[in-house]
């Protein structure tokens, strides 16, 4: 061995001292969650830092700190996201899978990641935990919140038709429009299915600024997220000036973390109760606060299913047989660099009785010119760059892979 060779030199100045070092068997797989310790075994990131005192407490040495994450699911999602970086030439990606009933996070992946066995000082922002610390304008993901709030206040019903919807709306010095032409008359349900900006902002005007602000506060979208990690982001503060209600209604001019957005989707899916996301098992749960009614939750879940199943929907590639996927897409510009897209898809499944919510996001994905999509038995190419053609596609592949594992682990899900 190298030690024996050095010892054989007979140099008195060579001394061997034993030392302890933490070795992580999964290297990159849980890098943003587990985090790192430094050479003195002090936690410097992730769970290692958040629970540094507990992990060093000799009285707790025999008490394991057990996480909610599933290694098999984490591996599969990590693999699909890495493939997505190549397929869509994206600069980054992220995903989080959460149990909608209790907030347990089964998987959390942020790319690029790093080998936590290498004690590097990772200051480059590309290694930021995109799910918990990344702060973004998430775009049309917010349209679900707008429709849910309007339904909950009995201002509209899913089949309420908004007539003579204009092609564009002038608000102060801005002109707001849709990316394509829609019929002049659309039901509330169709507005969400087709993802109409104009239709959504007209619904928001019925709600009003005060009620919308209260919803955002109740949904914890305007404050630092709660999670057992040091790496959390602060949504950028803003003033409710002219046009803010209109733009916030479809997810522009407001920032939040993906973790917060997926937590609100969990509440909408689970019957309307807010939950606290967590990565540590058997944590004392906070009392759930009602965000929307069960009736509203049921209505939204049905609409989100149609976003996936109807020809007009924006998430058709997520219609994986047997899993009753519902969800909403979001295609937005990076608020720091308007030349880059952020494409997001938040899915719930099974939508008839939701158990899980999955967020998939891709940073600056490009058109996959050589990719052949399998859509309703047809092989097609689509030279398009919206979330429906990348983030949705990736989410569908993930659900197809992890679905059997979740079905095995959850008997109730298996019989849906």
Q: How would you describe each model-predicted region?
A:
Residues 77, 191, 395:
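A helicase ATPase "motif cassette" and its flanking acidic/Ser/Thr-rich regulatory loops
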Residues 55-93, 101:
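Conserved, well-ordered alpha-helix/loop/beta-strand core segments that scaffold catalytic motifs
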Residues 32, 39-50, 91-109, 212:
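Carboxylate/His-rich catalytic cores and anion/metal-binding grooves
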Residues 1-62, 359-360, 369-373, 378, ...:
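Small/polar-residue-rich segments within soluble enzyme cores
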Residues 80-88, 113, 154, 308, ...:
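Structural motif corresponding to the C-terminal cap of alpha-helices
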């Amino acid at each position: 061995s190298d030690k024996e060779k050095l010892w054989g030199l007979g140099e008195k100045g060579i001394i061997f001292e034993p030392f302890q070092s933490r070795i992580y068997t999964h290297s990159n797989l849980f890098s943003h969650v587990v985090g790192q310790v430094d050479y003195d075994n002090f936690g410097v990131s992730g769970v290692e830092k958040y629970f540094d005192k507990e992990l060093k407490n000799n009285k707790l040495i025999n008490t394991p700190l057990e996480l909610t994450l599933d290694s098999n699911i984490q591996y599969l999602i990590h693999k699909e996201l890495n493939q997505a970086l190549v397929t869509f030439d994206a600069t980054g990606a992220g995903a989080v899978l959460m149990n909608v009933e209790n907030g347990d996070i089964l998987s959390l992946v942020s790319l690029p990641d790093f080998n936590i066995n290498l004690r590097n000082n990772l200051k480059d922002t590309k290694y930021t935990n995109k799910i918990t610390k990344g702060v973004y304008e998430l775009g049309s993901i917010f349209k679900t919140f707008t429709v849910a709030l309007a339904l909950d206040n009995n201002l509209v019903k899913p089949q309420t038709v908004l007539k003579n919807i204009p092609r564009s709306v002038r608000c102060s010095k801005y002109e707001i429009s849709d990316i394509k032409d829609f019929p002049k008359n659309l039901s509330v349900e169709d507005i969400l299915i087709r993802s109409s900006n104009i239709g959504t902002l007209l619904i928001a005007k019925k709600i009003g600024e005060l009620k919308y602000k209260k919803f955002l506060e109740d949904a914890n979208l305007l404050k630092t997220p709660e999670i057992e990690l040091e790496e959390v982001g602060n949504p950028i503060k803003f003033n409710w000036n002219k046009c803010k209600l209109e733009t916030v209604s479809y997810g522009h001019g407001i920032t939040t973390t993906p973790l917060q957005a997926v937590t609100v989707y969990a509440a909408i899916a689970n019957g309307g109760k807010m939950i606290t996301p967590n990565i540590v098992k058997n944590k004392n749960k906070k009392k759930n606060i009602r965000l929307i009614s069960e009736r509203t939750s049921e209505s939204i879940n049905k609409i989100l299913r149609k976003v996936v199943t109807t020809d007009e929907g924006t998430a058709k590639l997520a219609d994986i047989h047997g899993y009753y996927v519902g969800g909403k897409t979001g295609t937005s510009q990076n608020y720091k660099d308007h030349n880059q897209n952020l494409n997001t898809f938040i899915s719930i499944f099974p939508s008839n009785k939701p158990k899980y919510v999955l967020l998939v996001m891709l940073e600056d994905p490009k058109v996959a010119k050589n990719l052949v999509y399998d859509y309703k038995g047809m092989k097609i190419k689509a030279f398009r760059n919206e979330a429906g053609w990348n983030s949705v596609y990736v989410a569908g592949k993930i659900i197809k892979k992890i679905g059997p594992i979740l079905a095995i682990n959850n008997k109730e899900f298996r019989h849906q």
